[in-house]
C-alpha cells in the first residue's frame, strides 16, 4: 500500500509526567484528517479505495482502542461514524470506500477525551490516549485521487468546559505529492 503520511491522534493533558500543576493545565485533542477528492473527468467511473492506519505504537495508552472515533464526511457533507475501523484479521482503517468523479470525502480519526471512570483511571500528567503510525491510501486505480492530510488540534481548559484555542496544519505526504 502506498504510504500517505505519518499520523498522530491524542487526547491528553499538556503537563509533562511528574510535574506538579500550579495552575489549570490545558487539555489537547489532536485529530488526523484526510481529504480525498476525485476530479471530475469525462467517462470516469467511481473508484474504490482503502485508507489504512498501521500503528507504530501499541494503541493501549489511556483508554486505548475504545477511545477512538472514526468518522467520514460524505459527498453530501454529512458526518458518518465508522464502526468497522478495528476489525480482527483486517487492516485498521476505512476499508472498501468508494468515491465518484467530482466528489470529495473527508476521513478523520480522533480520540475522545476520557470521561467518568475512564478519566479517573488515567492519571492527569499526560493523561489520556495517544496513537501514532503511518496512514496509507490504496486506490484500485492509481493517479486519479487527490489526498490532503491535516492535523487538527483543539485546546480546552483543564476542566474541559471551555475551548481556549485551535489550530490546523498540513501534514507532508511521503511522496511530497497529493495525487495518489
Annotated model-derived regions:
Residues 1-37, 168-180:
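Beta-sheet-dominated interaction scaffolds and their linkers
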Residues 105-180:
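Terminal connector regions
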Residues 43-45, 58-60, 118, 144-146:
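Intrinsically disordered, low-complexity acidic/polar segments
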Residues 57-125:
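Intrinsically disordered, low-complexity Pro/Gly/Ser/Thr-rich segments with frequent PxxP/GP/PP motifs
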Residues 24, 30-58:
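Asparagine-centered strand-capping/turn motif at beta-strand->loop junctions
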Residues 12-13, 28, 52-58, 112-117, ...:
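Short regulatory "switch" loops immediately downstream of catalytic or recognition motifs
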Residues 1-12, 46-55, 61-68, 102, ...:
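Conserved long hydrophobic alpha-helices within structured protein cores
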Residues 23-33, 86-97, 124-134:
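Glycine-rich, flexible loop segments associated with nucleotide phosphate handling
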